[in-house]
Amino acid sequence: MKLIIDGRKKTVSHRGDIASLLRKLKVRREEVVVKLNGRLSSETAIVGARDKVEVLRVIFGG
């Protein structure tokens, strides 16, 4: 699958859901928004070999 994280493009081999992908990447779910094939996605969505996943960091604070 194609992965974009922090603006960097990668090709990654992964079978499973978004939650397991984030664990594999050591990314905290609370700090990101994930798009799967251009649409916002839940952590239970299943990722396939031909999918495009974009991990966008959320900026928060006061």
Regions found by a protein language model. Give the residues of each.
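Ubiquitin-like/PB1-type beta-grasp interaction modules and other compact soluble beta-rich domains
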Residues: 1-61
